[in-house]
């Protein structure tokens, strides 16, 4: 018996209907029995919504139709169906695999079977439609979609911050909070160097459950932020330091730019003394107004520019150190004590 999760599925939406086509993996042997395919209402096993049986001679044209399907709708509604399938397969003899000379009409197919295996599939099915319309933009299920995309690198197999799966789950939770809705897996071949196909499928499954698009947008934006930095690498776009623990200032910049979660974050790398002896500091926030206090006294408030998460405060007076700064935005506040400039 084999348990698998790699049944190929293509979907097409039209007039409130979902047309599905199932494709067996190329490595499968000959189908010897009826292949049963079922689709259940949710990934935890709810109501049965489709049951199909396909004879061996139909293996190259297995289709299904769902009326009024529940669509996967990104982070708004990351709905997935559960697909189950089972059938008996036979691995063929080496001579037949290599295109033996025996006439197919004269040979008995059963004589070429070396082994019979019962195969079961259990995997998720997300039904949705992504389209890029020239001069109009990107649409998910016919609604305009604004991509908030990052490139993702797999973590080490195991480290002091947990196993790879534990780290991926933690990463995706952080990316949800950041407001990301598209993840592009970096690497070549299977998607990442040193990662097997099963791990890549598990990663994509976790992404679907959290509402991330993966691999649907083929054009790679310039200066795409990268989630995980590498040892010895210097990139201002990395969102997580190479230690696997520390979120960088760029993470909070994009969180303030993309997330619906309230953000107020002083970018300490921008704190510096100007040529005139006064001080400058940039604060990232998605609030409408940020107020800055210097040594407990109101210094300045700034209103947000459209789509810009940066609030740049210049000419901050400093009579002596330590300098006490405090910022407020909405219901958020944060205080800083500066001892060195």
Mark where each language-model region is.
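Generic secondary-structure boundary/loop-capping signal
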Residues: 129, 221, 236-238
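Secreted/periplasmic carbohydrate-active enzymes, especially glycoside hydrolases
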Residues: 1-186, 191-194, 198, 202, ...
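Short, structured coil/loop segments at alpha-helix boundaries
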Residues: 60, 164, 230, 244-248
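Substrate-binding cleft/loops of secretory-pathway carbohydrate-active enzymes
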Residues: 223-232
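A eukaryote-biased signal for short, well-structured alpha-helical docking elements
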Residues: 235-237, 241-252
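Catalytic-core region of carbohydrate-active enzymes that cleave or remodel glycosidic bonds
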Residues: 192-224, 242, 253, 257
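Proline/serine/threonine-rich low-complexity linkers at boundaries of modular beta-sandwich domains
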Residues: 1-2, 254-263
């Amino acid at each position: 018996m084999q348990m698998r999760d790699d049944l190929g599925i293509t979907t097409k939406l039209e007039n409130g209907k979902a047309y599905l086509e199932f494709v067996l993996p190329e490595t499968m042997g000959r189908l010897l029995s009826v292949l049963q395919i079922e689709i259940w209402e949710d990934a935890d096993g709810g109501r049965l919504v489709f049951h199909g049986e396909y004879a061996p001679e139909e293996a190259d044209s297995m289709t299904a139709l769902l009326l009024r399907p529940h669509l996967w709708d990104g982070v708004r509604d990351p709905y997935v169906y559960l697909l189950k399938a089972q059938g008996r397969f036979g691995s063929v003899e080496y001579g037949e695999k290599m295109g033996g000379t025996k006439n197919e009409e004269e040979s008995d197919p059963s004589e070429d079977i070396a082994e019979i295996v019962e195969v079961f599939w259990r995997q998720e099915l997300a039904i949705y439609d992504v389209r890029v319309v020239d001069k109009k933009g990107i649409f998910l299920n016919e609604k305009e979609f604004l991509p908030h995309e990052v490139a993702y690198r797999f973590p080490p197999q195991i480290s002091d911050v947990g196993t790879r799966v534990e780290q991926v789950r933690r990463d995706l939770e952080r990316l949800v909070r950041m407001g990301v809705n598209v993840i592009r897996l970096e690497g070549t071949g299977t998607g990442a160097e040193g990662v097997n196909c099963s791990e890549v499928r598990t990663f994509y499954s976790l992404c679907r459950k959290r509402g991330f698009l993966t691999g649907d947008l083929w054009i790679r934006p310039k200066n795409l932020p990268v989630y995980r930095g590498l040892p010895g690498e210097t990139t201002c776009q990395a969102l997580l330091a190479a230690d696997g623990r520390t979120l960088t200032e760029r993470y909070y910049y994009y969180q303030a730019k993309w997330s619906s979660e309230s953000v107020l974050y002083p970018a300490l790398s921008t704190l510096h003394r100007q040529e005139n002896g006064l001080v400058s500091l940039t604060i990232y926030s998605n609030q409408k107004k940020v107020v800055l206090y210097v040594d407990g006294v109101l210094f300045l408030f700034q209103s947000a520019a459209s789509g810009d998460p940066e609030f740049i405060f210049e000419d901050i007076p400093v009579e002596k150190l330590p300098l006490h700064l405090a910022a407020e935005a909405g219901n958020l506040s944060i205080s800083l004590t500066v001892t060195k400039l």
